[in-house]
Amino acid sequence: MAKTQRLDIVTPEKVVFSEEIDFVVAPGADGELGILPEHAPLVTALKVGTLRVQQGGKFFKVAVSGGFMEVKNSRIVVLADTAERADQIDVERAKAAKQRAEQRLNSKGSEIDVHRAEIALHKAINRIKAAE
């Protein structure tokens, strides 16, 4: 029997995923990290990106908007600001959020918070890419 590891993806609102998996690739702060069973203990920051999860020979994606990941004793815990399985993403809503962020960035007003608009744009693009 192939070795597996537990993956828990948790947000402040809910547990998004909690099952045994074969492999995960996560968007670490310094680049992508591939985690196999019995990986060395690790704690890292996550950036906005997509978790790619292999479970039972099939792959699926989870869009995350930053957070932290801990790997210990063949258990992976992802504490994310937000997390959404690709098959549950409302693409039209994500496209609308992208358009709003682009409009804010293109506005000439001085009251715009450019940093927040850039983050919103990056998150919306990530959700759209994950759903593809």
UniProtKB/Swiss-Prot annotation:
SUPFAM superfamilies per record: Epsilon subunit of F1F0-ATP synthase C-terminal domain, Epsilon subunit of F1F0-ATP synthase N-terminal domain
GO cellular component: plasma membrane; proton-transporting ATP synthase complex
Gene Ontology MF annotations: ATP binding; proton-transporting ATP synthase activity, rotational mechanism
CDD domains, alphabetized: F1-ATPase_delta
A matching Pfam family: ATP-synt_DE
Main location: membrane
Cell location: Cell membrane
Record bears the keyword Disulfide bond: no
Topology in membrane: Peripheral membrane protein
Protein keywords: ATP synthesis, Cell membrane, CF(1), Hydrogen ion transport, Ion transport, Membrane, Transport
Gene3D superfamilies reported for this sequence: ATP synthase delta/epsilon subunit, C-terminal domain, F0F1 ATP synthase delta/epsilon subunit, N-terminal
Quaternary context: F-type ATPases have 2 components, CF(1) - the catalytic core - and CF(0) - the membrane proton channel. CF(1) has five subunits: alpha(3), beta(3), gamma(1), delta(1), epsilon(1). CF(0) has three main subunits: a, b and c.
Role according to the record: Produces ATP from ADP in the presence of a proton gradient across the membrane.
Family: Belongs to the ATPase epsilon chain family.
Name the record gives this protein: ATP synthase epsilon chain
Organism: Desulforamulus reducens (strain ATCC BAA-1160 / DSM 100696 / MI-1)
